[in-house]
């Protein structure tokens, strides 16, 4: 694996690079494990290294979506606006369990606490809706990137927020119209979006959002959308 100098990067974020992500093939079958660092190096991504990930879309009871701006300390896509929480299940027994994506949901609960400070007792795994999976690949810069099969999780609940500033620069609940304005600002270069959020916003998000009370027709655990 390539040697990359990380001495100029945020110390806490560098420590997280040692976490073990779940390596998969393009059909989301587990084939091994590797560090978060190796999974996010473009040099390895170009050779086909692919890992499992998730994106949480958290709505309050007014049906507003929680958006976050990633902190400037983040190694991939710093300062970009994105959905409520995005991360990876780890290669451990609890987060590898695949039945009804329970392992991914456990990872999401862990990261909702780590990033947004949401108390563990406020997140019930049974309240998370696993909708579908999305495959994508994107470069953050010349060194780092993403290559993931992304599990889409919806959660509608009022929660307590206490974000970690090392993870999150800013956050807000937004309406559909406000998201459309954010997409326009991103298109004009005023702000930056993560590539996965832009892909989802351009394709499925508003259709799903219109049907928060009846998501079952949109559940598809067989197909991986390759966007």
From Swiss-Prot:
Cofactor(s) needed by this chain: Mg(2+)
MF (Gene Ontology): isopentenyl-diphosphate delta-isomerase activity; metal ion binding
Motif extent (Microbody targeting signal): 225-227
Pathway this chain belongs to: Isoprenoid biosynthesis; dimethylallyl diphosphate biosynthesis; dimethylallyl diphosphate from isopentenyl diphosphate: step 1/1
GO biological process, one term: cholesterol biosynthetic process
Residues holding Mg(2+): 40, 51, 146, 148
UniProt cross-references to CDD domains, sorted A to Z: NUDIX_IPP_Isomerase
InterPro entries: IsopentenylPP_isomerase_typ1, NUDIX_hydrolase-like_dom_sf, NUDIX_hydrolase_dom
Domain Nudix hydrolase: 49-199
Reaction it catalyzes: isopentenyl diphosphate = dimethylallyl diphosphate
Quaternary structure (record): Monomer.
Family statement drawn from the similarity comment of this UniProt entry: Belongs to the IPP isomerase type 1 family.
Function noted in UniProt: Catalyzes the 1,3-allylic rearrangement of the homoallylic substrate isopentenyl (IPP) to its highly electrophilic allylic isomer, dimethylallyl diphosphate (DMAPP).
Major place of residence: other
Protein name listed in UniProt: Isopentenyl-diphosphate Delta-isomerase 1
Cofactor binding note from Swiss-Prot or TrEMBL: Binds 1 Mg(2+) ion per subunit.
Subcellular location: Peroxisome
PANTHER family: ISOPENTENYL-DIPHOSPHATE DELTA-ISOMERASE, ISOPENTENYL-DIPHOSPHATE DELTA-ISOMERASE 1
Gene Ontology, cellular component aspect: mitochondrion; peroxisome
Enzyme's top EC category: isomerase
Annotated positions of the N6-acetyllysine modification: 176
Domain of life from the UniProt record: Eukaryota
Keywords: Acetylation, Cholesterol biosynthesis, Cholesterol metabolism, Isomerase, Isoprene biosynthesis, Lipid biosynthesis, Lipid metabolism, Magnesium, Metal-binding, Peroxisome, Steroid biosynthesis, Steroid metabolism, Sterol biosynthesis, Sterol metabolism
């Amino acid at each position: 694996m390539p040697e990359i100098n990380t001495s100029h990067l945020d110390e806490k974020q560098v420590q997280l690079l040692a976490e073990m992500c779940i390596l998969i093939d393009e059909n989301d079958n587990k084939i091994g494990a590797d560090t978060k660092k190796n999974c996010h190096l473009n040099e390895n991504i170009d050779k086909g290294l692919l890992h499992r990930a998730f994106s949480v879309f958290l709505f309050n009871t007014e049906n507003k979506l929680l958006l976050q701006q990633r902190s400037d300390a983040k190694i991939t896509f710093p300062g970009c606006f994105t959905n409520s929480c995005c991360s990876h299940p780890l290669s451990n027994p609890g987060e590898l369990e695949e039945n009804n994506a329970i392992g991914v949901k456990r990872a999401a609960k862990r990261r909702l606490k780590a990033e947004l400070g949401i108390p563990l007792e406020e997140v019930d795994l049974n309240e998370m809706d696993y909708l579908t999976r999305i495959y994508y690949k994107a470069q953050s810069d010349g060194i780092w990137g993403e290559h993931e099969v992304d599990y889409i999780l919806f959660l509608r609940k009022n929660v307590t927020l206490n974000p970690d500033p090392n993870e999150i620069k800013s956050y807000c609940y937004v309406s559909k119209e406000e998201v459309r304005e954010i997409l326009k600002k991103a298109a004009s270069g005023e702000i930056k979006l993560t590539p996965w959020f832009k892909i989802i916003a351009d394709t499925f998000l508003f259709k799903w959002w219109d049907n928060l009370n009846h998501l079952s027709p949109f559940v598809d655990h067989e197909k991986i959308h390759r966007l």
